[in-house]
Amino acid sequence: MPDTLTVIDNRTGKKYEIPIQYGTYPRYGAAIPTTDFRQIKVSDDDFGLLGYDPAFTNTASCRSSITHIDGERGILRYRGYPIEDLAVNSSFLEVAFLIVHGMLPTRTELDEWSYDITHHAIVHENIKKFMDGFRYDAHPMGILISTVAALSTFYPEAKRIRDVEIRNEQIHRLIAKIPTIAAFAYRHSQGFPYTYPDNGLGYCGNFLSMMYKMTEKYTPDPVLEKALDVVFILHVDHEQNCSANAMRSVGSSLPDPYVSVAAAAAGLYGPLHGGANEQVLHMLQEIGHISRVPAYIKKVKQGDIRLMGFGHRVYKNYDPRAKILKEMTHRVLGVTEKNTLLDVAVELERIALEDDYFVNRQLYPNVDFYSGLIYQAMGFPLEMFPVLFAIPRTVGWLAQWAEMLDDPEQKIARPRQIYTGDDVCQYVPIEDR
């Protein structure tokens, strides 16, 4: 007999058996189909019970085989592969193939995939004209969101999302063009001429070239190129977060992927999602020196200020991505100018992890704690931080979108509500109000 949950409605005395469903890990993935609660009624004309879960803190909106997170034990896996293994042994484009296709590629498959991505990086000249229309001080993330949405008008065939070949073509285009658009957005804000993609460079090296190349050929530093590759791997996907949910929700109405990615990027734009590492840098700059860390910690414990870069909605342990980024930060600063903020960050982490106040509250460093230091060391301005998040996360969004389209259980997203407004009101003419 399958596992069930027995529910007794004290309003009627009736008993109901609700089936329990499991994912790969029963201890982590048990769920109840909330639609089964519709049968629980006081009378036949009763709508039935709804599940009330603001912000979806305990609601599984889909079945997914892309990313597994065990927040209690600090585990993150892409398609079953530990993030630590991929960060050391893989590359961003190989991980992108894994995320999109569900398996690691053969050498031939990886070569073909890399070639296709590389040779789709160029954008239409009219896209450049479109981007020229933004103010000189427009935020790069706003430019990115608008430009990705505009791509929809350049590829009208993209609306045929049930055609797998056409769908895959759009996936290639988006993964390839996002770095180009991101670099163009930066150069627009600086008043620099746009730099075209260089097919002789890798994915991350090409992005760095489009960002920083002037008149001479740009050769990326191998340490910085590898560091960016690892940072991108760590940001590819993270289960059903705000932006992934936006991608699925908008995508469920079956538009082309360009507008869905634009919607997901808009979700990422908010400071609670894609802007957290910028807030970490502001905090470290405010502290300024390791000697001021104890006083700052005291203010945090008094509730006067927040400790940025610590704690996570899912992780109740050390974020595995933060461990990798901590080591990578030291490598990056070994080839760039030394940043005293790293000393502040390390001391802040040390004190916090030894303090029962933070340990008891399960506040550990998250991915944003060190990523901002890496970006800053590589010369990226603060306003580019959410853009740098969007580049690799586009891969995850597209994988989530494709998985949703192939899932027969999925429908157009349409959550319910509990109405708390007035009952029937009588209209009053404006003269009598």
Show which residues each predicted segment covers.
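Non-transmembrane, aqueous-exposed alpha-helical and coiled segments at domain scale
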Residues: M1-R433
